Amino acid sequence: MAGVLSKLHNSAQHVKDLAAAYLRDGEKGRQSDIERKSNQFANVQLRIVVMGESGSGKSTLINALRGLDEDEEGAAPTDCTATTTEITPYPHPTLPNVHYYDFPGLNTVKFPVKTFMKKTNFAQYDLGIIVTGSRFTENDQLLAKALEKAGKPIYLVRSKIDETVRSERRRKGYNQEETLQRVREQCISSLKAAGIQEPRVFLCSAFDLDQYDFPKLKETVVSNLSETL
Ligand SMILES: Nc1nc2c(ncn2[C@@H]2O[C@H](COP(=O)(O)OP(=O)(O)OP(=O)(O)O)[C@@H](O)[C@H]2O)c(=O)[nH]1
Ligand SMILES: [Mg+2]
C-alpha cells in the first residue's frame, strides 16, 4: 500500500492502538500512546502536487488554498505570461507537514511535454491536483494517467469557471446550473476516458472563492489529509 492509502491505513491502526492501550492500561496508557504516535506523525510529510498546462491557474489556486492574496508576501508569483519556472514547495497554512508543490506549466518551450513527463517522478507525491482551463487537453490526460499509474489520488480542478459563466451568460435561455453541470460532466467523462475510476472534479474560480466548488475543494483537501496525520 503506497502514499495516502498507507497513511490512511496507519491512521485507522492508530485508533485501534489507542483503544487497545486504553483497555490495557486505562487513561495513562492512552496518553503515552498519543505521545508516541504524535512523535511518529510529526515526521510524516505529505506532498500535494499541482500540475497542468501553462497559465491554467496553478499558482493562483495554491495561493487561494493557502488563504493568500497574490501580492501578499510568500505568495506564489502569478501572471498572464508564463511565470513558474521551478518546482516550488509552499507550506499548507495550518498543517506544517503538508506542502503544495507548484509546478511549471506543461507544454511551454522551456518545459515541453516529453521532457516534463520523463523528468517528473510522480511516485514521490501523495496527491495530485490537475488544474485545467477551458478544455481538458491531451496533456491533462497524460498527467492523469501518470498519476493514476503511480497510484495517487487525483483531484481535477476546472479553473476560471467565472470566465465560462460570464461568456455563456450571453446566450439565449442561459441557465447557470445546467451550464455548470455540462462542464462537470465533460470533466468527469474526460477523466473516465483517461482510466480514472472515480473522478473527483471541482469547478473553481480564484476570484469568487466562496462560490462554485472552491469551499468544497478546500475542505476535502484538509479532511482527507488531516485523517492521515
Ligand atoms: N478569471 C480567472 N482568472 C484566473 C483564475 N485563476 C487564475 N487566473 C488568471 O490566469 C492567469 C495565470 O494564472 P497563474 O496562476 O499564474 O497560472 P499558472 O498555471 O501558475 O501559470 P504558469 O506558472 O505560467 O504555468 C493569471 O492572469 C491569473 O490571474 C480564475 O479562477 N479566474
Ligand atoms: Mg505558476
Model-derived features with residue positions:
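AAA+ P-loop NTPase catalytic core and its hallmark functional loops
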Residues: 78, 98-112, 156, 164-167, ...
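P-loop/Walker A phosphate-binding loop and immediately adjacent motor/lid segment at beta-alpha junctions
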Residues: 144-158
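Conserved nucleotide-binding/hydrolysis micro-motifs of P-loop NTPases
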Residues: 105-108, 135-137, 160-164, 207-210
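Canonical P-loop GTPase G-domain recognition
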Residues: 162-229
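Conserved G1/Walker A P-loop phosphate-binding module
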Residues: 2-103
